[in-house]
Each structure stands twice: as C-alpha cells, then as structure tokens.
Amino acid sequence: MQDAIKLRASGYLLKPSTVKDVKEELENLRNELKMDNCLFIRCFGDFDVFVDGRSITFEKAKTKELLAYLVDRRGSAVTSGELRAVLWEDAESDKNTNSYLSKLMKDLFTTLKKHNLENIIIRDWNTYALDTTKVKCDYYDYLDNKPEGIRAYNGEYMSQYPWAVSSV
C-alpha cells in the first residue's frame, strides 16, 4: 500500500476484488486534464514554440528571440535594459532600441493573445518574466531530470542564439 501512495495512485484494490470493486475504481480514476492551447517550448536544437502541436510565428524574428531569452531565464525577472543588451549586443541603448523593444513586446503579447496565452508573461514595472508553471518545455523537463527532457537533449541548446551557448 505504501508503494501505491508513493505513486500517487488514484485508486487501489486489494485481493480478492469483485467486478463491482474494479468498476468503481475505474469510474473514479483521476484523468489528466487536457489543456486547451497547450504551449510547448522546444529549446534543444533550434528554439521553437508550439501551440497544440503547431509552430507559432511572430511578426518580427527578434520577438521569438526575446521569448527565448525569457525561457532561458527560467522565470527570473528581466529588465528592459537587460533585454536590450542581449538582443542588441553592440548597440547603444537609445530611442531606436527602446522603441524597437516596445514593438517587440507588443508583437509578443499580440501573438500570445491570439492563442489565449498572454498570461504566460508576468509584467511588472520595467521587468518581464515567464510564468514557468504555464508552459511545457523540454529544457525545464531536462533540468527536472524527467525522462522526456533527458531524451530530448541532443547536445544543442537554442542553437540559433549566440547568448545561449553558455546556458546548458
């Protein structure tokens, strides 16, 4: 019985069991909830984002990189200044980069809103973070030593972004 408790089983039968006992346990099984608009983030290999198995596209390519950086930070708040430094390594922080970052944020929220997922980003004054509890991510599964995360790791992490090289 202790093993069943450790497994977090939703039912348990002791022998001898009747057909009625089995039927009752089957009727009371806890099924995993199906998530509508399930967001899956792939970090191993090239970074990509999927909703219900389909890759989503952003209006601007840098928006995807912005989201990738938030994923990489694993829920830690990131300032606008840090985002500018990462997205435009050599550029001075000026009106142009500030304006473009605002456009990227708008693109991010507009695209996520189309899929009813705008709540995955936590906004505060001058900071942004990813709510890691609302996404499924191969990298997070890997860090948690989940078998699917271990299997997904192929030696490359967000290979299209130079800043990601030192993360894994």
Language model: regions and residue ranges:
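Intrinsically disordered, low-complexity protein-interaction/activation regions
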Residues: L14-V168
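Alpha4 helix (beta4-alpha4-beta5 surface) of REC/receiver domains from two-component response regulators
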Residues: M1-G11
